[in-house]
Amino acid sequence: MLYDLFKLLAYSYKIIFSTETIERLLQVIPHNELYSSPIKGLFLRHSDQPFCYEDIIQEPSICIVLSGEREVQLGEQCYRFDNQHFMFCPVNIPMRGEIKCAEPQKPFLVMSMKIDIESVSKILLANPNLVDDVQQGD
C-alpha cells in the first residue's frame, strides 16, 4: 500500500543545521510565505504562527524541517517531522498537515527540494549498474 511505502521511505535521519545558518536564512527569506529560491525546485516555507493545510498533493520531494515541527496526515496515519527527521515523498500523494507551534521567536522553517522524476529516470536508464547495486544491497 502507498501509505506503507511512505512509512518505509520516511527515514529518521539526524539533520544538523547550525543555529547561525538558520538565523541567516531567517534574515533573507520572506516571512509567513513560501519562498521559491533561485535554485530550481528549492523552496523555503516560513511561518511565525500555527497553520493547517488540507487536500494538497505533495509532489515528489525531500522536505527538511530546519526549525519547529510539521505534522503530516496520510489517511489514518500521522507522521511528525522535525530537524532530526526528514520527509521523503517519492510520488504524488494527497495529504494534509499542521504546524501547531510557531511564533516570531521560534518560527517554523522548512526547506523542500522537488525531485524531478524524469531526470531520475534518465539517470537510472543511462546507468543500469545503479539499479543493480541497489537490488544487491550495495
Give the positions of each predicted feature.
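N-terminal regulatory/effector-sensing and dimerization cores
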Residues: Y35-V134
